[in-house]
Amino acid sequence: MTDKKKTSNKKKMTGKFKIVNKLGLHTRPAAKFVKAALLFQSDVTLAKDDIVANGKSIMGILMLAAEKGSTVTLTVTGPDEAQAFETLKKIIQNGFDE
């Protein structure tokens, strides 16, 4: 009997983006980001410096303390990653519509 291990062929989409809105990633833009991330099945992370946050957790996003001008790294992995990545990328690049 042989034991077959399934190997994970997970792909991921990742990109670095500058926070451009005046007040940075505070409660309102964090809520907008999380609300959009929750629409997708894919795993979403947002990172700044050495801190990696679950992109579907408002508390995690707020812990990044991403001020205007800081760079965040968006990573999306999962079945709808391309659509999720594009949606979340636009939200960041548009300054969270603030």
Task: Locate the predicted segments by residue.
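C-terminal structural segments of small proteins and small subunits
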Residues: 67-98
